Amino acid sequence: DLSNVADRRSADFIRRMVYDPQNTLPGTIMPKTPMPDSWRDLVSRYLAERRGAGGEIRDPTPPASRPERPKSGRELYTRFCAPCHGASGRGDGPNAQYLPVRPTVHADSAYMSQRPDDTLFDGIYGGGYILNRSHRMPAFGLTLTREEIWALVRYLRELCRCQGPDWSRNGR
């Protein structure tokens, strides 16, 4: 709930989170969203002015070191995808109930087998709007490495127990 974020966080912290969430709060799942800096400034100012009933303003103490980065596709999925898509890929993560559109069901082999791997990569890298899907699906291209995104694609194939369409796998 960001309705009173200015009561809980300093304007500087809010700005840093909007500009570079991963370095501001190591371990956060909030991705760095591609947008012009002028928009980042507007979002930061808007949030910094959102006051509620009052409260303590505090910034978290950064950890002494960065948390270890998840290595496997499963670990990456658990950290970055499961909050919306669910731990088993059924579109039933804890955040799903708050979204206007149900997250894609990654365990649905009929649906997922129609999606080539490069399309899955593009959706993770660029966000849902790239695929004409929900704009609520954030872009992770500035948060995850290419190798991590490919590890996620491979894990999606494990969840659905399927492969992409033949035409996308036969090298044509």
Predicted regions located by residue number:
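Short amphipathic alpha-helical segments
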Residues: 96-97, 165
